[in-house]
Each structure stands twice: as C-alpha cells, then as structure tokens.
Amino acid sequence: MVLKKRRQEAVSKSISKKQGAPVEGLIAALSSEDDAKRVKARHSLVAMGKAAVPLLAEALKKGDGLVRWEAAKALGEIGVSEAAPPLVKALEDEEFDVRWLAAIGLIGMNIKGLKPLLHALMEQGDSVFLREGAHHVIHDLAKGGLRKYLAPVLAALENVEPAISVPQAAFHALEMLEKKRMVSNTWKHSQ
C-alpha cells in the first residue's frame, strides 16, 4: 500500500511538472472502442492518483456510459478521500453498472468514503438509487468495526419509509463518528 501511494505521488509530480500533459487524451481514450486502449488509459489515470481525480470526476458527470464506467472504476482504484464525493454522486447514475462500480469503490475506501455518503443520505434521502447504492456500501462496511455506528442507518434503509427515516439515521451516525473522531468534523461539500 505504501509503495502504491509513493508511486502515485511520483507519477502525479512528474505529470504536474509537464506543461500540457496528455491527461485530456487519457480521458478521451476512456471512450475508445478498443478495450486495450481504454484499459491502458484507465491504468495511466489510476497511476496519477489524486491528480487525476478532478478530471475523472468531470468525466463521471459528462461522459457517455462507457466513459462513466471507466471513470468510476478508476476513482475506486485510486481510493483517495477526494474520490469519494464523485463516487457518491455516481450512486445515482442512470446506468446500473456505473452505480455498482461506485459502490464497490466506496466500499474499498472504507471509512474515507463514509462521510460524503452519510451527507448525501441526509440531503437526498428520497433518492431511490442513492439509497440502493448506500445500502450496498453500508451493508459491507457494517460487517466490521463500524457496525455499531452503521446498523441504525442500515435498518433505516430497510425501513418501510426510508425517505423519512434515512436522513435522521445518517445524521446520528455521522454525529457519533465525529464524536469518536473516526471522521473529521469538517467536510467540504463538492459537486
């Protein structure tokens, strides 16, 4: 894990030093019909780490289904906390595969992706796609040490009236996690 992070940082530094780096070309290659070209572009973006997150987040919002799929997969593989908000937003994507990859990415982030997810549930608890994706993520995360914090949110997601019960359960879970300092109590909402 440490070697992966160091490699991503080194690649990010070398790319940021180059003027006019071909990052946009890599994003464009995510829509290629050529599987090998698309996978190579995604791997290059993942190797960039945090530096690729803003462009991937934009591709996740504006690209076609294939581009959004690749962007969601790349953001999940990068796994930095900055990738969580766009992945949370992708839980509402029209394509099931994109929503699934966003959930898998958030599960892989563990607690790093939890705060933006809980915020989204507080603000948009009426979104069916968001609740379905959140259920997938929270169900997996509640299997570990986060169970006592997330079990009420999971119960609310499975409730007869989740649109009413989920925002409050998410608020209380976030409040408990902040009190235990498991998540920071400052969070910048970005969309």
Where are the predicted features?
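Terminal, non-catalytic domain-edge segments
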Residues: 180-191
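Buried hydrophobic core positions in alpha-solenoid tandem helical repeats
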Residues: 25-27, 55-57, 86-88, 116-121, ...
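Structural detector for internal amphipathic alpha-helices that build alpha-solenoid repeat scaffolds
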Residues: 2-20, 28, 35-50, 55-61, ...
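Helix-adjacent hinge/juxtasegments
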Residues: 94-98
